[in-house]
Amino acid sequence: MPGVVMDNANIGGLRHGPGNTYPQDGLSHSRGEVAQFNGANAQDGPVHVNGVEKNASQSRSVEAIPSNHASRVTKGPPELPHITQGFFPFAKLVNRSVQQCWNDLSDLITEMAEMQVNSHGIHPSTAPTTGKSPGNQSPGNIRKKLRILEFSHAKRAEFIKLLVLSQWSRQAADVSKLIDIQNFIRTRHQAYTNALQWVGDMKRDLVQAQVANPDLKTALEVLSRGKVASMSDLGYKPPRRLTVRGTLRKLQKINRLIGARLVVQDEIPPPFKSYRVHDGRVTFAVPGEFELDLSIGEENENSQFFFVDIRFLFSPSPPILKGRLLNELEMTINDVLQNSGLTGCFDLLHNLVLTNKINILFKQATELARSSWSDGLRVELLHRTLVVQYWTLKPGTKSWLEIGIKSGHRKSDSESPGLPSLKFRWVRDGGEVPCEDIAFDAKNLSMETVLRSVIALHVSHTLSSAYCKIRQSSLFSTGFLSLRAHLTRTEPGDCQLDVQLTETRHLQVSIEPMSGVSILSAKPTVSDRFDMERNPERSSVEDIVSRVARIRCNAAIEEIESKVKMLGFEPLNPRAWKLDIRRIFPPNFLRFTLFSHQLWGRSWIVAATSSMDGDSWWVVQLRPTLPAKGPPIPHANGYGQPILRSAQVVTDSFFPARYDIDDAYLANLGHSLSGILAIQSNARYLSDLQSIKFHPPPHKLKIEPDLRVPDILVRYDVSTLPSVFRVAMPAKAKKKSLIRDTIRLAFHGVDPREKCAIMVAYGNLVDSTATLCPLISSWDRSLVFQKGGTGFAMRLLAPAGHPVIVSLLENLQRLECVLSILETLQRKKVEIRTFSLSSISFIYGSERDLAASLNIHLSRNESLMKLSPTDLASRREFLFGLRLGIQFGLQNPHRRIQESLASSLNRSPTEAGLETVVELLTLTLPLMRALDQLMANPSHSGPLRLHVTVRNAKTYQLHYPGDEARFQLVAASHQNRLVWVLKDANSQGNSKNDDSITARLRQTLYTSKGDGWKGLETGVVAEVDQVGNLLRELEKCFVASRADRADPKHKPTDYAANHTGLNNPEISALAIKKGTTDGAKLSLSDSLTTLPNDKGNLSQADTAAQKEDIIMID
């Protein structure tokens, strides 16, 4: 019956009356004695809780009685065993019921909250007779009320049951007694039944122990007479003993009977078609299974075959049964032969062999799982199906092999019935696959061989799949790297995949047969810090491919890092720079590294990227956020965060040429990387300018397979250049370009002294350079010309990464300026000695004894150089400022008017100024030589006699300080030819000249005529090459005047008294003016315009003289 529920008032109370006792071993004890024994426990509290002791086990159903009460004997009946199993407190039932009620109420409230109730219920138009409002009678509201009512009724019924149980539990003591009585009755009934069973078994066993009484009489008769007279004689005669020949005839007769029977009558199953009749028996042989010997017992053709012997043809095979088991097998086979014939016999033995083979394979698999394959196999035998799971510890999908017996049901299109056979079912990585290639020998059973064959096929499939995926990569599909797979069907340890990582490193991929873990071993060893990522959800093929890819790329990067460090390449940490390099590279690359070099500009670095599709070198352009004057790029601590501007791949492999990678090759590689970086920086600069055409574009500039750096073809046309890059060229150079419009910019190595990249610009002139080659300066190596052609080359130096486009445009325009100047000088019959881009040296004079050099200087606006190419091209200011200069030797007389001539050179246009200077050199040469003679002062201790002020190359003021006499010497045009005009420059009111000097000058010069000069009353005109004679005559006048003043008897003449007097001057040093006046014109015809009589011209010269500075030279 169900468990008894007790009220809390009886918890711990005893359910026996005052006279109850506890039986123990046939003895009974009073209740008081038990209470006295358990007195210690009774003091602490109730001994029983709902009839169960506090320290008793829950599995005990009968209360244990202390053993020390066994000696006590009572006269009453024995105490019944007390049943306490299944009792529980009534309070627990109440608590659980209350809790369940609360939970159901919460669910009811939630359910009602989800019900939608229409707030506007349907109200009748008339009020009910009771006068009460019916309320909301909508269907939703009615359903809520019904749910509340149903819940209330259900819970009320439950609590009524609890009330009934509460009342009944108060009488639980009587019910407990009834339970004990019922248990006692059942125990007695079971004991009675057991006694009857024991008596029956004993009676049955005694039958075998019965022994018949000995028949001594019969035994005596047999022993004495040798026979028993009471037994009847049937008249049988013992057969004659067979001889050897007779035995042979009998066996041959049996053989004939068996052979004829098998041929004519019996139905032989197909597996028994191969048989052999011998020795009075027939032997049926089933290859790989068994040999069965049968024979006949009668000549009757309908008699059955009988079992003789059986031999198994596979190994290992169980031993031939002996004794009782062999008898059982013989009886079974004979029964089958009698009922089903040979076909039934074959089916029996065939299934027996198949089952036996499965059991043998199961035992072998179990031994493997316990020994060498421990933790790698899981073996189960389900009926006649062997399941072997391998690689049990490998995460992901599982693989196993099932070996079972396939039923040989007849196929619909087959006439012969099928035979049961051992079949395999292979589940590889969660999917069933064909298993025809599994190596299985039915004669020699070996579970390890089968398992190794299955694992070898699995490994081969994995490695071949990985081979196909890796083969799809460009590096392996093109044959740049080798990939070979060694696969076998029998031995998994021989399956491996050989992968060439780099030129010198190889990787061997294999799979451990017992655990299924892929093993990657590289030679030489490669760092495995990038081979730590494992995804258990990824398949083995994907895992191998991804690991091979990571290791290959890591090996390639390690190799390139180790090789280029000796070239001075310094690796960079992109994390320190906070550069997101991955966003500018293709998504398929796996590893990369950045390098900088001390020879490169700080805004360029190179990157080496590696992927399964190839290894590449990239040039990366950065835009630093700090000023240009900063530390070199490897030291990133003091930098602002650089900005990635562009990246361009420049090679398709780390080593483009498949040669021996030696030190020389690495040096060439470093040379090529520096060169491509220099070329890329110039191409990027031209691309940003957008106004100068060039070819090829930056994305097509790559290092050639022979490590040759490509060139850039730049279209040079001054007319299309942005105005900021133009230079004020000579007039002829503006009209006609002297350089053809295609310039080839090439990289020619690194200058070891300057630590700069050498960029060479190749171009062609419009005219031949045959006359220019001998004139090129030997010390200037920045410009060379082609002998016998029109080609030229310019050498430009800049750190790799710094564009030379600005310098190229500057030098090309400088070259055009030089060529224009050379053409002008040659047209003026000036002999050129040497020239370069910065100076032109030439000789002049009638005897070609005077040398001079023209200097060409181009200044840059450094503030504009800091702008980006785009901003620079949009500016209207000029980046270059052209200024020409002329320089003479210390012995050249023209050194005194060097600055004046330089000022004439820089007038616009430049060519006009140059022609003017060449004419001025011819014009002023006699004058300069005459002044040198007048200034000859070997002792350098004489007083200042003559002071010459150079207003410009054609205007001079002669001042004799001692005589306060001033003269102006001007080049002018007289009768359509150039002459020198000397006239008095003293003001009429401020003249302090001695009348004798004035008279002497008038008499000697103004009204006289000499060699190459002639007086004009107010001045003197002299030929250009005879002006020295005029100056010497002038000097003689002052020398004579000084001599007269030194003689005390000297008296001024009347002629001298009527004129302004002159002091006795000393010859002064020559004063030279720097620069020119506004009145001096570039055109010679404009400068030499009037004769000395023109006072307006004199006034203009005096006005110009007041605006000029004077430089004193000894």
From Swiss-Prot:
GO terms for molecular function: transcription coregulator activity. Pfam families: Med14. Residues 1-27, 40-79, 120-141 are annotated as: Disordered. Residues 126-140 have a biased composition (Polar residues). GO terms for cellular component: core mediator complex; mediator complex. Component of the Mediator complex. PANTHER family: MEDIATOR COMPLEX SUBUNIT (PTHR12809), MEDIATOR OF RNA POLYMERASE II TRANSCRIPTION SUBUNIT 14 (PTHR12809:SF2). Belongs to the Mediator complex subunit 14 family. This is Mediator of RNA polymerase II transcription subunit 14. It comes from Aspergillus niger (strain ATCC MYA-4892 / CBS 513.88 / FGSC A1513).
